UniProtKB/Swiss-Prot annotation:
It comes from Caenorhabditis elegans. GO terms for biological process: asymmetric protein localization involved in cell fate determination; cell fate specification; determination of adult lifespan; embryo development ending in birth or egg hatching; establishment of mitotic spindle orientation; first cell cycle pseudocleavage; heat acclimation; maintenance of protein location in nucleus. Belongs to the 14-3-3 family. This is 14-3-3-like protein 1. It is found in: Cytoplasm; Nucleus. The gene is par-5. One of its GO terms (cellular component) is cytoplasm. Interacts with daf-16 and sir-2.1. Interacts with atgl-1. Interacts with hcf-1.
Amino acid sequence: MSDTVEELVQRAKLAEQAERYDDMAAAMKKVTEQGQELSNEERNLLSVAYKNVVGARRSSWRVISSIEQKTEGSEKKQQLAKEYRVKVEQELNDICQDVLKLLDEFLIVKAGAAESKVFYLKMKGDYYRYLAEVASEDRAAVVEKSQKAYQEALDIAKDKMQPTHPIRLGLALNFSVFYYEILNTPEHACQLAKQAFDDAIAELDTLNEDSYKDSTLIMQLLRDNLTLWTSDVGAEDQEQEGNQEAGN
């Protein structure tokens, strides 16, 4: 007998508390595949699960890539590092494809409210961005898909959501990171981040009490990135790990 949605959600919550994010993602994938529109709680559980699952691989990939570069001159060590990097890349690729399939087949099409649509399109932009970080052959196509999803989300967010809404702010944060890291256009990244920050500051009185903490945190991250990027415009060797991203 298959688990009910309630049981799967409870399983996901248990897995989160135990920090077993692969189990959490597997449970929320099953919830999504039931074909019903997710509640806000379910949506956030899905996002947190996959963010942690993919985040672990992104972190591993960066470490291994760095080791691979440092082993130049030792052919055997470099080959071992390369093989391990390719293994992690495949895992990362599989996870991203899983998420993108859920988004295209279930989540985006079922999203009724503008908030949900923006959330899922931002997520689509994020996971294509993660693919772009490690892609080589089809990178241009992946980058284009990421930019298209982010832009569609931003168009809806600007039309339907307050500038202080945490999802709109998180979208601006991650889209600006995309411009900085993936397209290597710091001026565009700064412009997008500054616009989002300024728009939110101008409408601070619209801050929802429930999301006050989330909104102000993301505004701080936008400002942190702006500080980092404006000091870095013209410099070529900035470590990308310093760039802040939105959690969900």
